[in-house]
Amino acid sequence: MKPWLCLVFFTSAFLIWHAEAEFFTSIGQMTDLIYAEKDLVQSLKEYIRAEETKLSQIKSWAEKMDVLTSKSTSDPEGYLAHPVNAYKLVKRLNTDWLELENLVLQDTTNGFITNLTIQRQFFPTEEDETGAAKALMRLQDTYKLDPETLSRGNLPGTKYRSSLTVSDCFGMGKTAYNDGDYYHTVLWMEQALKQHDEGEDTTVSKVEILDYLSYAVFQFGDLHRAMELTRRLISLDSTHERAGSNLRYFEKLLEKEREKPSNKTVATTEPVVQSGAYERPLDYLPERDIYEALCRGEGVKMTPRRQKRLFCRYHDGNRNPHLLIAPFKEEDEWDSPHIVRYYDVMSDEEIEKIKQLAKPKLARATVRDPKTGVLTVASYRVSKSSWLEEDDDPVVAKVNQRMQQITGLTVKTAELLQVANYGMGGQYEPHFDFSRRPFDSTLKSEGNRLATFLNYMSDVEAGGATVFPDFGAAIWPKKGTAVFWYNLFRSGEGDYRTRHAACPVLVGCKWVSNKWFHERGNEFLRPCGRTEVD
């Protein structure tokens, strides 16, 4: 089939891009899945057309034979008295019915199945589905979205409306359950049950939902509600062995509670805990609440007094000859530590070229293990990144040179240009750009990361801010702009105030590129100050 030939060509390109999975970590790479699915739909249509043609031929044959046999069976001997009819009967049974048999046995599925088999090896994996579900939960927590809001697709800045079915909500709950996350299990199983009760058509049964929900509720110590849900389950399926066993166990626990003198009254009058009454478990991140509040635009400590100390100006890079005629617009984002934003740093054409160069090289972004120093993937950094060299394209050298002119620092000892694309709920939780390991082998030749130059290569419809929990700043992405700050004091000591985070992307696709300038080569470009904190 022709679609199969087209697909082989498409898949060869798909293979180059997606030798590594983890689609959920990069929206840029997930866009290819859209085209892959469209190609499969086209292949499916071809299969349907072939099946319809085949059935049409069979139907035509059946109708013709129905008329003929009605005539022949009404007077068999009279019919066969005509020698032509006798011949045609023998011919039909020996030849024509054999041809029909071959038509019926003709396999039109081969092309579609071949397509599907080829494509499937590049499909998202179980890990991708789990990662995507956790991304939605991360957005739910960070931006305080209830399951109803997410399920109905009521998100700010969205161009396309999309909703979650009972099956989708059930899948979210199962992912949380399998991860031992009973908080989100309860939230999503309750949403699945709510939509089921509203009459939504689904293949998921209430029994399945109640089975997970009752156990998750029990894990929160809500014995009364666990019993209520289990009884509801048994009323729907009295043969459910596990539910019956659980109910007997719950009743024994309740009886023990009632036998305790101090709990005698409470046990018989305690009301059923309502939906949403369960608290989110404590997190490993100490500044979680501050970080998430800043991501929502809350808790930003931009006072009128501080605002008065922030200015806009034209920046010529300390009278850099290249910038005297065309200086950059510079805006103070924060006073201490000093964070500035530059406008029109990269053109749309340069941004598209950088993205084009980066896409084939995108790989899951890593972090350095604080104990071993080894680079590894981490759940708190969800994005894909690649590194571009000046030899890759003249535009890379041009952008590097521009950052050098703006900052007055040398790029000779700086790291390669890193390009990052954030996936579903893409984020990088609070971290330092500089190394806090004094004997880090990576610091021996080039020194520590002196400064960060961060280019925003896309607008983001919602979320995706760069936040600094220590002093309460939030900087929102704006395509073509860049922000710059020093990670180290002039003494070389780390400025711990610069601990920052990339907030989860709620709606949109976030592209950034950054350059980390190192200490070596900048000793005289940014000399030591008089004190350790200059």
Curated annotation (Swiss-Prot):
It is found in: Endoplasmic reticulum lumen. Its EC number is 1.14.11.2. Heterotetramer of two alpha-2 chains and two beta chains (the beta chain is the multi-functional PDI). Belongs to the P4HA family. Catalyzes the post-translational formation of 4-hydroxyproline in -Xaa-Pro-Gly- sequences in collagens and other proteins. GO terms for cellular component: endoplasmic reticulum; endoplasmic reticulum lumen. Pfam families: 2OG-FeII_Oxy_3, P4Ha_N, TPR_P4H. One of its GO terms (molecular function) is iron ion binding. InterPro entries: Oxoglu/Fe-dep_dioxygenase_dom (IPR005123), P4HA-like (IPR045054), Pro_4_hyd_alph (IPR006620), Pro_4_hyd_alph_FE2OG_OXY (IPR044862), Pro_4_hyd_alph_N (IPR013547), TPR-like_helical_dom_sf (IPR011990). Transmembrane segments: none annotated. Keywords: Dioxygenase, Endoplasmic reticulum, Glycoprotein, Iron, Metal-binding, Oxidoreductase, Signal, TPR repeat, Vitamin C. TPR repeats lie at residues 207-240. 2-oxoglutarate binds at residue 510. It catalyses: L-prolyl-[collagen] + 2-oxoglutarate + O2 = trans-4-hydroxy-L-prolyl-[collagen] + succinate + CO2. It comes from the Eukaryota. Its cofactor is Fe(2+); L-ascorbate. Binds 1 Fe(2+) ion per subunit. This is Prolyl 4-hydroxylase subunit alpha-2. The keyword Glycoprotein applies. Residues 1-21 form the signal peptide.
